[in-house]
Swiss-Prot record:
Required for accurate and efficient protein synthesis under certain stress conditions. May act as a fidelity factor of the translation reaction, by catalyzing a one-codon backward translocation of tRNAs on improperly translocated ribosomes. Back-translocation proceeds from a post-translocation (POST) complex to a pre-translocation (PRE) complex, thus giving elongation factor G a second chance to translocate the tRNAs correctly. Binds to ribosomes in a GTP-dependent manner. It comes from Sorangium cellulosum (strain So ce56) (Polyangium cellulosum (strain So ce56)). The keyword Hydrolase applies. It is a peripheral membrane protein. This is Elongation factor 4. The gene is lepA.
Amino acid sequence: MPVDSKLIRNFSIIAHIDHGKSTLADRILDATGALTAREQKEQFLDKMDIERERGITIKAQTVRLDYTAKDGQTYRLHLIDTPGHVDFNYEVSRSLQACEGALLVVDATQGVEAQTLANVFLALDNNLAILPVLNKIDLPSADIERTTREIEDVIGLDCSGAIPASAKTGIGIAEILEAVVERIPAPKGDPNAAPRALIFDSWYDSYRGAVVMVRVVDGIIRKGQKVRFMATGRDYEVTEMGVFTPHATAITELGPGEVGFLVGNIKSVVDTKIGDTVTDAVHPATTPLPGFKEVKPMVFAGIFPTDSAQYEDLRDALSKLHMNDAAFVFEPDTSEALGFGFRCGFLGLLHMEIIQERLEREYNLDLITTAPSVVYHCYLNDGSMKSIENPAKLPPPNLTDRIEEPIFRMTVHVPSTYVGAVLALCQERRGEQKSIQYASSDRVIITYDMPLSEVLFDFHDKLKSVSRGYASMDYELVGYRADDLIKLDMLVNGDPLDALSVIVHRDKAYARGRDLAVKLKDIVPRQQYEVAIQAAIGSKVIARTTVKAMRKDVTAKCYGGDISRKRKLLEKQKEGKKRMKMVGSVEIPQEAFLAILKID
């Protein structure tokens, strides 16, 4: 029998990076006796090595805990750990939809930061009860009063019931568990209605196929039942069900409010879309759960093997990652400069870095990644629209009416001392100021609309350096906007290098072209003839550098004698060089591309 839903509490933990979310989850597991002493390790829920090293959570993890409260009742707590990074925003919103409450963890030494705010607003959108927890109070620099004031001013939450805690030393953990039971509402749901369950995570298991994490809202899902995924319309038989306690434990049914996993010979996670509704195949629910949307990649880059013999290995590795991560897409791509490879789409820069690192680390591949680009909307003169992911595929200017680029709403939290530097940086990146708000006397929230292409390269690094590491940022897509965008080509000896084509704003094209030309000059090997390196917009060259020719001293054997003799030899050499230049093609080593793409 499913447990009485009055005794269930579903909650997640939301926090900015490094505010102590995973450590708090560890302490909660310890306090409820979920782990034996042998299993207790740092960041138990962060399963991937990369998660542990970077101290971030990428995939949401879920644990069922049984907790006996002070009132003598045993409650079933479901802790749903969410990723905190903005790239995984949609995953966070679905994980939060599976909960009724959230612990808002704020580092008492740092105060409210940008991603805390973004995730809190997601939680408020889903009508969750929010319990503020002030973490790290064991540190001498913790300022509880200032932090509570900031939460009240910036987020507008009542902090009279905020719980001071230290996940490291275990202070306040018992109070947090009691507050979860008392202040987070029990799930509502009709056990007799047609089953509806929300998919909030899925991953691929090489033996069982896709494993789907669900939160049941209405009805009961049983082992052996035929279920339908409403977004794809596909039917599967539930061959296995279970919960994590935190180890996988088999069960036979899930009732309203419960969280668990389903297995049903599902071939790929592409069929298990996050936010989709699972219902009964024979008597399906009439309406799916609200809020589902397809996740679209925002950032594209080419990934090429440095050794072309690794092409098949790269294809296999990408297929395996795609099975586990439906938001990551790829298709074959060829480049004249880099050979065969793949054009890959990611949710954002962090997502791209993680995929690249996993390819190199888990599959031992040696890769070149081209400069990341965003998806541009190119409107042609006939009124049709093309999505351009690869700058080399942009139609010629005489056919295009306008090009639109994605605009992101940036929210930057910064100490007031550095406001000037941050504003200057945002202006320089073609930002449009929306608002400036003082969270407290020394913390400012700046909002800007900015093209994603300007954020991509090194905006985050620059922001950290102008604010001495104190600024934090968050962003969300607000739409597309037309601007004066053009394609910049790099030519070596008159031949375009497709791997270095970029779409830039006209005002920045000259500086960008000059920089690339100067960098290429140091990298292109010297030939027997002069090599021209040019940056061009269409047929107009805007910057040029020249790699000087290597030449033999043809006059070395002339001792004295008439000048015309020497001139004749030099003219003959010049003719030969000219002929070579007409037929010669410059081989550019892959290291050259690596060096340039790294500089970007």
